[in-house]
């Protein structure tokens, strides 16, 4: 086991604070409408240019082990805030730095760090309460666009495209971000339910231009096993042929003789059929088949519920207005399922989302809700170069998370104003002793920091602006983009409540841990081996002069 260095007291905290400052100073240059970019080296390819706080924080590793520990703890603040709220990473980092800086003064003056921590916790609970009181729900598309714009570093176009995506697929809908092919951002909306399985044979194609199979007003057969014997399918095919309508078959697999017969019948024009593999795997496949059954008003033909292929009637089949099957995707538009059944299914899946333990499961369940509830929107990000594309895509994803957070918990005035108003509304928070009072005081001082940094990055005098904003009331604040004062919400400068709340809670939590640190343990730096001279055994090389 490698030898360890143990550092105590003031020296340990001082080294940790150095690390905090290095990371926070690199991150905070990106804050506000006039924040600057940070360029990140890549081991191969072009460097990445970003204005996203968490991307900068994640890149930072310091050589000094103790400094690095401080930096990593603040990095944790940024990534936790990003995971929970999707945005506000720079605000969280700036708050953490300010709390540590103010707190270290009190610790150095001999105050009890544990009481300081208790004071910090009391102040945060009170401030969060005030933020919730200030919060107002997002109702209009305009507000959603404004939240997106602010989060995307004042890019209007991004805010608008996210708002129109939410308009089209609903606030619960799935919105994904992809690389675009042109210079401009584009929005594609897929209505109905889409899943990532295409036709099993290209002979099913009936729309050569789009290379897809389109079925109008089809029946939908859902089967949870393989179909390889055509005899099992014959009764269903005969009933569908009599009705004169097309048929979509979704099964675990359609193969061999069954697939060949379906293809031959389609080519001859006897029956219009398309066969598709069922989406998902294992239990998720069963759940998705059940979703499609509810959406189309049909049943999943499964032996465990006593249904077999031979006994299927038209009443067991689902129906839809239109189905489009491409090489890789199938879209069911306007299924015939009852609205009440679909709503009940959505509620059931939402309960599962709340109980889900892994992010992956939660994401998949949310996709299912969206597919049942409305549709899927794809934002295609356009840019001139790959470097710009990466930077823009990261901003669009941030903005999307921020708008989701705004829909979830509402909005407050942006530009650091909400925290100042929370401080004023909280009034006199009292601790149990003088040291706790100091902890409360340091938080109330530290929450001015986001506004100070926004103003500093815009090239103005921070103290003057903070005092002017504190003298105002309500949403009155400072618009750093053009140097004017006014109502932040009217000017469209909004922050999601969840983002501001999460940033404050995470920053205070980690900063309080740093203040209560008394010892640090890190691996001792390895001594470099002395450089060796030339290896021996090279003597006897004299007398090599040449007589000319």
Curated annotation (Swiss-Prot):
Q: What is this protein called?
A: Chaperonin GroEL
User: Where is ATP bound in this sequence?
Assistant: 30-33, 51, 87-91, 415, 479-481, 495
Enumerate the GO terms in the molecular function aspect. Answer: ATP binding; ATP-dependent protein folding chaperone; isomerase activity; unfolded protein binding
Q: Which enzyme type, at the first EC level?
A: isomerase
Alphabetized UniProt keyword annotations: ATP-binding, Chaperone, Cytoplasm, Isomerase, Nucleotide-binding
Catalysed conversion reaction:
ATP + H2O + a folded polypeptide = ADP + phosphate + an unfolded polypeptide
- SUBUNIT field: Forms a cylinder of 14 subunits composed of two heptameric rings stacked back-to-back. Interacts with the co-chaperonin GroES.
Q: What is its main location?
A: cytoplasm
Give the enzyme's EC designation: 5.6.1.7
Which InterPro entries does this one have? Chaperonin_Cpn60_CS (IPR018370), Cpn60/GroEL (IPR001844), Cpn60/GroEL/TCP-1 (IPR002423), GroEL-like_apical_dom_sf (IPR027409), GROEL-like_equatorial_sf (IPR027413), TCP-1-like_intermed_sf (IPR027410)
- What is its biological role? Together with its co-chaperonin GroES, plays an essential role in assisting protein folding. The GroEL-GroES system forms a nano-cage that allows encapsulation of the non-native substrate proteins and provides a physical environment optimized to promote and accelerate protein folding.
The terms describing its cellular component in GO are: cytoplasm
The family classification in the record reads: Belongs to the chaperonin (HSP60) family.
Q: Which GO terms describe its biological process?
A: protein refolding
Location in the cell: Cytoplasm
